[in-house]
């Protein structure tokens, strides 16, 4: 990402813990720092927020949630997952996942405002900037 050792990693929705660990380890051994894109979509992760935290701590993978999920989780499980990780300080970045201006618009400002209300202001700023730049 941007000439750094960070690499955005998107996995399958039904990926197993072992396969996710193997992918992260392979990238780490190659000298990269994996940033796991929207872990709130991966069934194994969303079913066990505590295990996701353990996964993050053990593998060194960073977690990037979608701004849409922060603003309006699609279901109880996404809400529980997102709130738990934010409370634990285990989210490393928030990104828009914008594909166009109509169906998936950039909503980082709204996500940032939500984060400043529901988390620490410094943490909110850290989440919407990555390497000193707005995500």
Protein language model features and the residues they cover:
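Extended substrate/RNA-proximal surfaces in nucleic-acid metabolism proteins
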Residues: 1-59, 63
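Structured loop/turn residues at beta-strand edges in well-structured enzyme cores
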Residues: 2, 88-89
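Active-site environment of divalent metal-dependent phosphoester hydrolases
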Residues: 16, 41-45, 70-73, 99-103
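Charged helix-capping and loop-helix junction motifs
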Residues: 21-24, 47-54, 76-86, 108-111
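Active-site neighborhood of phospho(di)ester-bond hydrolases with catalytic His/Asp-centered motifs
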Residues: 35-37, 64-67, 93-96
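His/Asp/Glu-enriched short active-site or ligand-binding loop at hydrolase and phosphoryl-transfer sites
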Residues: 60-72
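Short acidic/histidine-rich active-site segments
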Residues: 90-106
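Mid-to-C-terminal alpha-helical segments outside catalytic/metal-binding sites
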Residues: 108-135
């Amino acid at each position: 990402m941007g000439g750094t050792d960070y690499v955005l990693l998107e996995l399958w929705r039904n990926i197993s813990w072992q396969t996710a660990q193997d992918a992260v380890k392979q990238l780490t051994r190659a000298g990269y720092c994996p940033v796991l894109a929207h872990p709130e979509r991966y069934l194994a992760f969303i079913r066990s927020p505590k295990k996701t935290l353990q996964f993050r701590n053990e593998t060194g993978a960073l977690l990037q949630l979608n701004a849409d999920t922060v603003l309006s989780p699609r279901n109880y499980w996404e809400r529980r997952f997102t709130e738990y990780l934010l409370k634990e300080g285990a989210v490393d970045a928030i990104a828009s996942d914008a594909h166009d201006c109509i169906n998936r618009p950039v909503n980082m400002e709204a996500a940032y405002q939500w984060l400043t209300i529901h988390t620490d202001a410094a943490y909110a700023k850290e989440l919407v900037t990555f390497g000193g730049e707005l995500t």
